């Protein structure tokens, strides 16, 4: 049987490939491959597609870079925003040429990213239905999980919510009458790409913390470490296969239980490959950066450190379960600098646009951070359905259409 997997284009005001890959989707592909299905894959966001050979798009550092884009008409809800709205990713024509070679797939899977990227999902569904009107279409991912009611308006046959692979296997088997067995080891199947500039990895699932703005608990309710030997094998195998130097960690709590997890992974990896560079695009917890941890990260060749400070406002920190207090943050910076990290390598995330947040809170945080050798990274708040902050926003701003996925765009 044949299965077609699709990662849609992005419709947004801006988009940049900052180690962006559909990691969970690649695990679903691995599941079907190990169950004997023939796999076809199209990633609109693949910057290594041959289409890019004929255009000039600037590449960034460490495998990151810009996407091909085309300006498009803004949806009505954005009409007063004085910015250009764009469609990022491979052109529709490239996708259609690809589909012409895929005869009668048995199932079609579409992953969904940020809730406000919904227009890319709609585009793909509409095209797919023209080509394969009777083929079952299944969607999953972030938008499908957090905006389930909105997703029901799409012309799809099944919407999977969350990341429970056992539930997915049961639901799929029950609905379509095909037994899907869960293998002992399930990991992202990178073989769908001919070339990669970087690898993204998770050493754990879920998060032991419960920040008010974060939706991870709805996706992965329990924190669980992966087998570190399995992670090491995944890194070494794919780094060698694709000649990769850059590895980005997707963990929500990368340094949690450092000695028992990440430290062991780094120690084993360097025995096989000492030329890798590591990056932490997700904010890490400053309180876990002790002196020895900072030196280990430096020795392991971490090039991108992103710390989550979020705010210096004490009441918000105490109420909302955020990742750090300021003294822990100061210590983490001290240890990182002592270990040899530079200002260019240390970025600090602060949140802006939280429900009820006044501009002075953000300004004060920025002014204080200017006294430290770090790059300030403002993370604009995006309301995630089901989170505590989303419910607060609904109460504070009852007249705003917060439940509309397009309105959840932080731009």
Provide a role label for each language-model segment:
Residues 2-244:
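Acidic, low-complexity intrinsically disordered segments
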Residues 4-11, 15, 20, 42-52, ...:
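C-terminal accessory regions of radical SAM enzymes
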